[in-house]
Swiss-Prot record:
Record: glycosylation sites: N103, N285, N641
The protein, known as: Mannan-binding lectin serine protease 2
BP GO terms, sorted: complement activation; complement activation, classical pathway; complement activation, lectin pathway; proteolysis
Tissue-wise expression: Highly expressed in liver. Secreted in plasma.
Site, as annotated: Cleavage: R443, I444
S-S bonds: C72-C90, C152-C165, C167-C180, C184-C211, C241-C259, C300-C348, C328-C361, C366-C411, C396-C429, C433-C551, C597-C617, C628-C659
Annotated function: Serum protease that plays an important role in the activation of the complement system via mannose-binding lectin. After activation by auto-catalytic cleavage it cleaves C2 and C4, leading to their activation and to the formation of C3 convertase.
Organism the protein comes from: Rattus norvegicus (Rat)
All copies of domain CUB, residue ranges: 20-137, 184-296
Annotated EC: 3.4.21.104
PROSITE patterns named in the record: ASX_HYDROXYL, CUB, EGF_2, EGF_CA, SUSHI, TRYPSIN_DOM, TRYPSIN_SER
PTM section of the record: N-glycosylated.
C-alpha cells in the first residue's frame, strides 16, 4: 500500500512538470522518392519534424547515395534547425569540400528539424537516394559543454521534457527560476569588533541579491570601518555604481555608494549604529569586499589593586562595558566599608567612570573563640589575636576531664577556628572515669564508712524507697531496673543526689531525670533477669573530686572478675542493726563461683528468683559481708590493674532476705553482658 502511495505521488509530480499527459511519441522514416530505385530529376521535397518542448530530434542515415558535386550544388540533403544549417550532404563519401553523412548522427538545436531534398536537371549515373530515421529524445539541459552558459546558479535537476533549479542553504531561488539570491538581510553584529563581507567572499558574489548588515553597539561606542584585502564590485565608467553597489548608513549620515576595484578609505562613523547595504544585479562576475570594524569609547581610569589583593583582567585600557574583578590573597576578604563581599566586579560606564568604588582586602578575623565547657582557651599567637593563621589552645580542666585531640585550633581563610583534623566544632572535654582514693578493706555489714573521694560515682536515689546508682557519664546514671520501676512516667518523683557521704546531708549536688530506660527484657515481679536501667539527666553535672563517673568495663574485664577476685560495693542500705546507714558504707567482697551460687539459691530459694547467666555473685561462704536493701542499683566495682582505673562489673540486684547470711550471697547484674545495650541507648538518645 505504501509503495502505491509513493508511486502515485511520483506520477503526480511528473505529470505536473510535463503537463496533463505524456507527449506523443515522435519518430519515423524518411526516404527519397522512388527509394530504393533511383530518384528523378528536378526533385524538391521538405519535411518539417517537430518534438514536444524539452525534447530534441535525432536523425541518422542508413543509406545515402546522391550525386557528388562541388559544395553539393547539384543534388543534396540539407538539415536545418531554426535559422542554423546543421549540414548539407551529398555523394557517398566525404571529400575536402563535400560531406556525406556516413555513420554520423545529427541533433536539432531545439524541438524542430527541417530536412530538405533537392536534385537538379540531370544525373549521369543512377543514384538511389537516401533512407533516414528520426526520433525525439529528452534534452538534458543540465549537461552543458565547455563554454556554454549554465542554466542554474547552484543545482540543476533534469526531468523528462524539462529541468528546474534549486539553491544551497542560505539562498533562495529568484523569480526568474534560474538565479540563486543570497539570504543576507537582517544580520546583526553586537561584538565590539569583527569582520563582515559580501556573500561567498573572496569567491564571486551572487546575483540579484540584496544584503543588509547591522552593527549595533551600546550607546557610548563609536564604530570605525576599514576595508581590507580586496575590493571588487561591478561598476560603469560613466555612471556611479548603476549595477552593483555598497552603501553605509549611520544615524548621522550616509557613505557611498561604493563600487569598482579600489579599496574605499577608512570611515570613522562617530556612531554606535551602522547599517551596510549591498545590492547586485543579474550580471557580472566580481569577488566583492571585506570590512573589519572596530569600536572605541571614553576610557575609565586605570584601577589600582588594594593592598593584599589583585585585579583581573589587567588591560592597557578599559572602556565602556569593560570590567575587572578584585581578588584578595588567601586569608583576606573583600570589604566595602564595613560590609563583607563574596565577590566584586566593577563595570566601566559610558561617561568614563566605574560603577563601584574599589573595596579593600581586610584580613580574616575568626572572632573570639567559643568557651569550652569544663575547659579553657589560651591565645598562642598573642593576647586576643583572632586573625588569619592565629593559633589558640583549648585545654580541659586537669584531673577531672580529658580531651582526645591536641586542642590546637587555627584561624583559617574561611573565618572559622579549625583543628588540625579540619574540624570546626569545639573539642569535647570528657569526664575522667574510675579515679578513687579508696583502698581495700572495710565492710558494709560490719564495714567502715567511706571517706571523701572514695566513691565519687555513687548516686543516691530517693523516692518511695531508697536506692543507689552509679554515674557513668556526666549526664547518665546506671542503676537496677527494679530500683526505678514505675519511674519512666513519674520521673518528677525521682530525687537524684550526688557528691555526698551522709545520706541526710543538706549539702549535695541535685540532678533531675530527663528520661528513664529500663531494659526491655526485664519483667517486674518475675525474677531479676536483665535488672538494669539507665537514667538520662536533664543537665550535665560538674565533675570534681567528689563527683566522677565510674568506667565501663573493657573487653578484658572478664579476666578481672573471676572467682575469688575481690570487688567493692558501697551504699546506704540496711546495716546489721536493721537501719539505713547514715553514712556511705563500703565493703570488699570476693566473686563466688556462678554454679556454686546458683546451687545455693536452689537450696534456699529467693521467692520468684533464680541465678541466670546475666548475673554474678559475691560474698563469703560464712557470710558477714554483703550489700542489703537500700543498696539496690549501686555499683560493684573492680580495679583495672592495667589502667589503674575502677570499673563497674556488677549492679546490686537481689539476694537473701538475711543479708550477709551464710551461703546467702549477694546477686549482681553482670554489666559486661550489657555493654552494647548501654552504648546503643546513650549514642541514640
Amino acid at each position: 500500500m505504501r509503495l502505491l502511495i509513493v508511486l502515485g505521488l511520483l506520477w503526480s509530480l511528473v505529470a505536473t512538470l510535463l503537463g496533463s499527459k505524456w507527449p506523443e511519441p515522435v519518430f519515423g522514416r524518411l526516404v527519397s522518392l522512388g527509394f530504393p530505385e533511383k530518384y528523378g530529376n528536378h526533385q524538391d521535397r521538405s519535411w518539417t519534424l517537430t518534438a514536444p518542448p524539452g525534447f530534441r530530434l535525432r536523425l541518422y542515415f542508413t543509406h545515402f547515395n546522391l550525386e557528388l558535386s562541388y559544395r553539393c550544388e547539384y543534388d543534396f540533403v540539407k538539415l536545418t534547425s531554426g535559422t542554423k544549417v546543421l549540414a548539407t550532404l551529398c555523394g557517398q563519401e566525404s571529400t575536402d569540400t563535400e560531406r556525406a553523412p556516413g555513420n554520423d548522427t545529427f541533433y536539432s538545436l531545439g524541438p524542430s528539424l527541417k530536412v530538405t531534398f533537392h536534385s537538379d536537371y540531370s544525373n549521369e549515373k543512377p543514384f538511389t537516394g537516401f533512407e533516414a530515421f528520426y526520433a525525439a529524445e529528452d534534452v538534458d539541459e543540465c549537461r552543458t559543454s565547455l563554454g556554454d552558459s549554465v542554466p542554474c546558479d547552484h543545482y540543476c535537476h533534469n526531468y523528462l521534457g524539462g529541468y528546474y533549479c534549486s539553491c544551497r542553504v542560505g539562498y533562495i531561488l529568484h523569480q526568474n527560476k534560474h538565479t540563486c539570491s543570497a539570504l543576507c538581510s537582517g544580520q546583526v553584529f553586537t561584538g565590539r569588533s569583527g569582520f563582515l563581507s559580501s556573500p561567498e567572499y573572496p569567491q564571486p558574489y551572487p546575483k540579484l541579491s540584496s544584503c543588509a548588515y547591522n552593527i549595533r553597539l551600546e550607546e557610548g561606542f563609536s564604530i570605525t570601518l576599514d576595508f581590507v584585502e580586496s575590493f571588487d564590485v561591478e561598476m560603469h565608467p560613466e555612471a556611479q555604481c548603476p549595477y552593483d553597489s555598497l552603501k553605509i548608513q549611520t544615524d548621522k549620515r550616509e557613505y557611498g555608494p561604493f563600487c569598482g576595484k579600489t579599496l574605499p578609505p577608512r570611515i570613522e562613523t562617530d556612531s554606535n549604529k551602522v547599517t551596510i547595504t549591498f545590492t547586485t544585479d543579474e550580471s557580472g562576475n566580481h569577488t566583492g569586499w571585506k570590512i573589519h570594524y572596530t569600536s572605541t569609547a571614553q576610557p575609565c581610569p586605570d584601577p589600582t589593586a588594594p593592598p593584599n589583593g589583585h585585579i583581573s583582567p589587567v588591560q592597557a585600557t578599559y572602556v565602556l562595558k569593560d570590567s575587572f574583578s578584585v581578588f584578595c590573597k588567601t586569608g583576606f576578604e573583600l570589604l566595602q566599608g564595613s560590609v563583607p563581599l563574596k565577590s566584586f566586579t566593577a563595570v566601566c560606564q559610558k561617561d568614563g567612570s566605574w560603577d563601584r568604588p574599589i573595596p579593600e582586602c581586610s584580613i580574616i578575623d575568626c572572632g573570639p573563640p567559643d568557651d569550652l565547657p569544663n575547659g579553657h582557651v589560651d591565645y598562642i599567637t598573642g593576647p586576643e589575636v583572632t586573625t588569619y593563621k592565629a593559633v589558640i589552645q583549648y585545654s580541659c580542666e586537669e584531673t577531672f576531664y580529658t580531651m582526645s585531640s591536641n586542642g590546637k585550633y587555627v584561624c583559617e581563610a574561611d573565618g572559622f577556628w579549625t583543628s588540625s583534623k579540619g574540624e570546626k566544632s569545639l573539642p569535647v572535654c570528657k569526664p575522667v572515669c574510675g579515679l578513687s582514693t579508696h583502698t581495700s578493706g572495710g565492710r558494709i555489714i560490719g564495714g567502715q564508712p567511706a571517706k571523701p573521694g572514695d566513691f565519687p560515682w555513687q548516686v543516691l536515689l530517693l523516692g518511695e524507697t531508697t536506692a543507689a546508682g552509679a554515674l557513668i557519664h556526666d549526664d547518665w546514671v546506671l542503676t537496677a531496673a527494679h530500683a526505678v520501676y514505675g519511674k519512666t512516667e513519674a520521673m518528677s518523683s525521682l530525687d537524684i543526689r550526688m557528691g555526698i557521704l551522709k545520706r541526710l546531708s543538706l549539702i549535695y549536688t541535685q540532678a533531675w531525670p530527663e528520661a528513664v530506660f529500663i531494659h526491655e527484657g526485664y519483667t517486674h515481679g518475675a525474677g531479676f533477669d536483665n535488672d538494669i536501667a539507665l537514667i538520662k539527666l536533664k543537665n550535665k553535672v560538674t565533675i570534681n573530686r567528689n563527683i566522677m563517673p565510674i568506667c565501663l568495663p573493657r573487653k578484658e574485664a572478664a579476666s578481672l572478675m573471676k572467682t575469688d577476685f575481690v570487688g567493692t560495693v558501697a551504699g546506704w542500705g540496711l546495716t546489721q542493726k536493721g537501719f539505713l546507714a547514715r553514712n556511705l558504707m563500703f565493703v570488699d567482697i570476693p566473686i563466688v563461683d556462678h554454679q556454686k551460687c546458683a546451687t545455693a539459691y536452689t537450696k534456699q530459694p529467693y521467692p520468684g528468683a533464680k541465678v541466670t547467666v546475666n548475673m554474678l555473685c559475691a560474698g563469703l561462704d560464712r557470710g558477714g559481708k554483703d550489700s542489703c536493701r537500700g543498696d539496690s542499683g549501686g555499683a560493684l566495682v573492680f580495679l583495672d590493674n592495667e589502667t589503674q582505673r575502677w570499673f563497674v562489673g556488677g549492679i546490686v540486684s537481689w539476694g537473701s532476705i538475711n543479708c550477709g547470711g551464710s551461703e546467702q550471697y549477694g546477686v549482681y547484674t553482670k554489666v559486661t553482658n550489657y555493654i552494647p545495650w548501654i552504648e546503643n541507648i546513650i549514642n541514640n538518645f
